[in-house]
Amino acid sequence: MSKNPLGTLVVRIWKAKNLPNKALVGKQSPYCVCRVGEVVKRTQTDKRSGQEPSWNAVLEFNIPSESYHIMKITVFHEGFRKHPHLIGDTVLSFEKAMKEELQSEWYELKNEFQFAGELSVQFKFIPTDPLYFDRASSKPVLQFPYSSVAALTPVPKKPSKPSKPRKKVPVSHPLPPTPPSREEHVSVPRESSLFTYEDDPLPSFPSPYMVDDYYTQDVFVSDNVNDYSYGVQNPTNPRLSVEDYDANHSSLPPVPPPHLILPTASSSQIFH
């Protein structure tokens, strides 16, 4: 703060109304906190006054310059163990009091952009210089003129050239191509080169009589083993004949040799 302030602002926090009740049980105990710049002061707590407290508190603030004309007032409820609960706040200007010495109004409180009651505040500014209000009233006020020199003097306009008539040129838009007809879209090329039956032993669509004739033909198997080498493998051992090779590699078990019947002696000959 400067040593020679502009003056002293006397604030009277009178009363409030329509405050929301923040007390869980019983009536609330509200108080106000005022701030101007970096200076913060508060009122006394009105015990159990509820929604319409009355403080009638007077606070003084030193105003260093005319730029300090904004005040923020916050109303709290003093809960258990003096824990503060926000009721509402407002930001107001006392610039009118710095020009006319007095200002008294009701101000609306808000809490998260919702209505939280009204607060009655009075301002009185006491300047350090006794001629402060005379100087403030004698200051020239710049008013916006109703007419200016620029508005009275017309701006010269350049002569406009005569416009040439425009020729209308016909514009031709190409038509979209005609879609193919359904017959052309579904048609199948009938070229003989696409379907050849020369390499096929049977036609693609045989008749039932042709199928019966084809599958009922007699199949003759050659007796020569060498003609069907894929059916019977050649013997790996050249000493074995084909009959021996087939006997050894047959899926059936081999036939046992016949038993030899030897002559046996009778019991009379043995114990003779």
Curated annotation (Swiss-Prot):
It is found in: Cytoplasm; Nucleus. One of its GO terms (biological process) is actin cortical patch localization. One of its GO terms (molecular function) is cytoskeletal protein-membrane anchor activity. Residues 158-170 have a biased composition (Basic residues). Keywords: Cell cycle, Cell division, Cytoplasm, Mitosis, Nucleus. Residues 1-107 form the C2 domain. InterPro entries: C2_dom, C2_domain_sf, C2_fungal_Inn1, Ingression_C2_domain. Gene3D superfamilies: C2 domain (2.60.40.150). Signal peptide: none annotated. One of its GO terms (cellular component) is mitotic actomyosin contractile ring. Residues 155-187 are annotated as: Disordered. SMART domains: C2. Pfam families: C2. Interacts with cdc15 and imp2. Involved in the ingression of the plasma membrane during cytokinesis, leading to the separation of the daughter cells. Unlike its S.cerevisiae ortholog INN1, it does not play an essential role, probably because the actinomyosin ring is connected to the cell cortex by many more proteins. Belongs to the INN1/fic1 family. This is Ingression protein fic1. The lineage of its organism: Eukaryota, Fungi, Dikarya, Ascomycota, Taphrinomycotina.
